[in-house]
Amino acid sequence: MAVQQRRVSKSRKGMRRSHDHLTISNTVACNECGKALLPHRACRDCKTYRSIKLSIK
């Protein structure tokens, strides 16, 4: 196994991890009930997708 040659400072560790943050996903409003949901997903409350009623069992 590899062993580190030098200790990694807090600053260097933070700089390496600077791109690891999570991004906030965009939300859109449902056309029927107006509830916020992820794009390209069916609404769980009114069971519609792009104003088309779905028959979910």
Curated annotation (Swiss-Prot):
MF terms in GO: structural constituent of ribosome
Gene Ontology, cellular component aspect: large ribosomal subunit
Q: Would you say which domain of life the source belongs to?
A: Bacteria
Q: Does the keyword Ribonucleoprotein apply?
A: yes
Q: Which InterPro entries match?
A: Ribosomal_bL32 (IPR002677), Ribosomal_bL32_bact (IPR044957), Ribosomal_zn-bd (IPR011332)
Matching entries from SUPFAM superfamilies are given as: Zn-binding ribosomal proteins
Q: Which UniProt keywords apply?
A: Ribonucleoprotein, Ribosomal protein
GO biological process: one example: translation
Q: Which NCBIfam families match?
A: rpmF_bact
| Family indicated by similarity | Belongs to the bacterial ribosomal protein bL32 family.
- HAMAP family attached here? Ribosomal_bL32
Protein name, as recorded: Large ribosomal subunit protein bL32
UniProt source species: Ureaplasma parvum serovar 3 (strain ATCC 700970)
